[in-house]
């Protein structure tokens, strides 16, 4: 059993993009699906599908690459960890990497990006960053 499903998922995405794989498989969790929806919306992944196999669900992710074959994921980091939670207020969630990167924040209004959290005037737990 994986202790930190978000860190495991981000590591699998990072490893698959470095190896230039087209697809990768992640463990299913609602929080992982919420993060993947943000990644898809921002163009870091092409698509993802949830599949059932022997009463266990998996998420299959199709990675996105540019026309030269480079991955759209340059770096992905887990910021808040089970042993050390990181929380930020609204005014600490401004632009990241001059708008090229995204910070994923878990708020009372759901899992959203740092820019949406700033617009909605909410803070929360900083889950991960990607650029």
From Swiss-Prot:
Fetch the SUPFAM superfamilies from UniProt.
Answer: Ribosomal protein S8
InterPro entries with a match to the protein in the record: Ribosomal_uS8 (IPR000630), Ribosomal_uS8_CS (IPR047863), Ribosomal_uS8_sf (IPR035987)
Listed GO CC annotations: ribonucleoprotein complex; ribosome
Q: What keywords is this UniProt entry annotated with?
A: Ribonucleoprotein, Ribosomal protein, RNA-binding, rRNA-binding
The GO molecular function terms of this record are:
rRNA binding; structural constituent of ribosome
Q: Which domain of life is it from?
A: Bacteria
Give the Pfam families listed for this entry: Ribosomal_S8
GO BP terms, alphabetized: translation
Give the matching HAMAP family: Ribosomal_uS8_B
- Please give the NCBIfam families that the UniProt record associates with this protein: PRK00136.1
Described purpose of this protein according to its UniProt entry = One of the primary rRNA binding proteins, it binds directly to 16S rRNA central domain where it helps coordinate assembly of the platform of the 30S subunit.
Query: What is the protein's quaternary organization?
Result: Part of the 30S ribosomal subunit. Contacts proteins S5 and S12.
**Similarity remark:** Belongs to the universal ribosomal protein uS8 family.
Official protein name in the record: Small ribosomal subunit protein uS8
| Originating species | Helicobacter acinonychis (strain Sheeba)
